Curated annotation (Swiss-Prot):
CC terms in the record's Gene Ontology section: cytosol; secretory vesicle
The name this protein goes by in its record: Hydroxyacylglutathione hydrolase cytoplasmic
Lineage, highest ranks first: Eukaryota, Viridiplantae, Streptophyta, Embryophyta, Tracheophyta
Originating organism: Arabidopsis thaliana
Record-linked PANTHER family: BETA LACTAMASE DOMAIN, TENZING NORGAY, ISOFORM C
Outcome of mutating D58C: Binds normal amount of metal, but reduced enzyme activity
GO BP, one annotated term: methylglyoxal catabolic process to D-lactate via S-lactoyl-glutathione
Binding-site list for substrate: K144, F145, F146, H174, E175, Y176
The protein's enzyme class: hydrolase
Quaternary structure annotation from Swiss-Prot or TrEMBL: Homodimer.
SMART domains: Lactamase_B (SM00849)
Amino acid sequence: MKIFHVPCLQDNYSYLIIDESTGDAAVVDPVDPEKVIASAEKHQAKIKFVLTTHHHWDHAGGNEKIKQLVPDIKVYGGSLDKVKGCTDAVDNGDKLTLGQDINILALHTPCHTKGHISYYVNGKEGENPAVFTGDTLFVAGCGKFFEGTAEQMYQSLCVTLAALPKPTQVYCGHEYTVKNLEFALTVEPNNGKIQQKLAWARQQRQADLPTIPSTLEEELETNPFMRVDKPEIQEKLGCKSPIDTMREVRNKKDQWRG
């Protein structure tokens, strides 16, 4: 399995997932279809289907166009989201196969949108796990609670995604990492892992390189939204429960002007 970034718009990422045995490919959130198709051609891959994380235009806005450009392509999207151009709806636990060797598991991760899907991808033997989290989980952050609650985001981040293997690579929908880590330091100023990752992320961006992927293990160490069960964070924010802490961290992030 190979995964390639396709930078789009101002700070979006689409992704190309290639099964090396067959050259078959899936694309995640191809908002700029021409760019994604060019990447597939460069890597001599054949696009078979689209994995849409959620209905927002900067993720699903290229679906109709890619259907025109790639005959017989399938477009997957969450059954509870009104995904533009969707041909096949998926629900939590649905399984797909790409080529000969890649398994894909749909995970319902609502809150940013009510039907948001994250896609957990690995090889036939479970090797090289990766998860495409759209705007639910960012590196050191999470999406705004546009269509859901703190309870839902807690379930999505701290139960559903946190249960994946720790080496799982995290591929999210936007390059927000530096700002997210700067905010994370306001929550945990003495967290050395956050300090180290922020220094690295700044270097990456100065070199015009992506900060993605992260890993689930790194997120559990540095992402304040995945650390809301930590007593020291709850105490600092004056909260009594992980869900209250999730709500408070989101409120602080929404008001933060770093």
